[in-house]
């Protein structure tokens, strides 16, 4: 099971997330994101056994692999328009998708991604927008699902109940400012998520 906190920019926030039970830490390498970090900054942040996830948007596979080497990533989370031919060959992939009412899981049937990370719809934004989606849509999928988008301690149990996911992910709803985690909100989210997932 995955308990992920995304948009980590400091060692302090990473330590607090892991202490509260996070099993995956997300670093954003999309330059237009307010949570952007360089590969060197990410490399300097230790994660004590939690999976290291890099967020990318329409980045060249060779560049993803280069950043993964520098930052010691375990997973590439691809948020753009990437198809299987754009996946980095040497890295586990989580493919992010924005869920709309007519979302079709069949488009990912041939995807070699380890999981689909489902996010709420948000025009021109690639994650971190804080929008939820209809979690019941995820329950019908045969894919391994990570639910993201607008999650915090107040709603993660309901999301797990309706979506039956492999994991959950939160970013903007547990911040005091973009790129700066609110430790109490983050801790409350992770504790609620652990209880809901039976982790």
Curated annotation (Swiss-Prot):
Lipid biosynthesis listed as a keyword: no
GO molecular function, one term: phosphoribosylanthranilate isomerase activity
Gene3D superfamilies: Aldolase class I (3.20.20.70)
Record's signal peptide: none
Pfam families, A to Z: PRAI
Keyword annotations of the record: Amino-acid biosynthesis, Aromatic amino acid biosynthesis, Isomerase, Tryptophan biosynthesis
EC main group: isomerase
Domain of life: Bacteria
Family: Belongs to the TrpF family.
Protein name in the entry: N-(5'-phosphoribosyl)anthranilate isomerase
Species name: Solibacter usitatus (strain Ellin6076)
Primary gene name: trpF
């Amino acid at each position: 099971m995955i308990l992920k906190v995304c948009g980590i920019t400091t060692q302090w926030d990473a330590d607090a997330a892991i202490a509260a039970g996070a099993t995956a830490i997300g670093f954003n390498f999309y330059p237009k994101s307010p949570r952007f970090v360089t590969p060197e900054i990410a490399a300097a942040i230790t994660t004590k056994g939690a999976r290291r996830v890099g967020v990318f948007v329409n980045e060249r596979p060779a560049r993803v692999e280069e950043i993964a080497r520098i930052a010691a990533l375990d997973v590439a989370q691809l948020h753009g328009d990437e198809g299987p031919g754009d996946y980095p060959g040497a890295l586990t992939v989580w493919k992010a998708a924005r869920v709309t009412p007519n979302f079709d899981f069949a488009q990912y049937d041939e995807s070699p991604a380890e999981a689909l990370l489902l996010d709420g719809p948000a025009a021109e934004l690639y994650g971190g927008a804080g929008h939820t989606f209809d979690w019941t849509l995820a329950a019908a999928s045969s894919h391994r699902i990570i639910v993201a988008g607008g999650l915090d301690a107040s709603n993660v149990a309901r999301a797990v109940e309706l979506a039956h996911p492999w994991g959950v992910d939160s970013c903007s709803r547990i911040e005091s400012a973009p790129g700066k985690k609110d430790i109490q909100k983050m801790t409350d989210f992770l504790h609620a998520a652990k209880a809901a997932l039976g982790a």
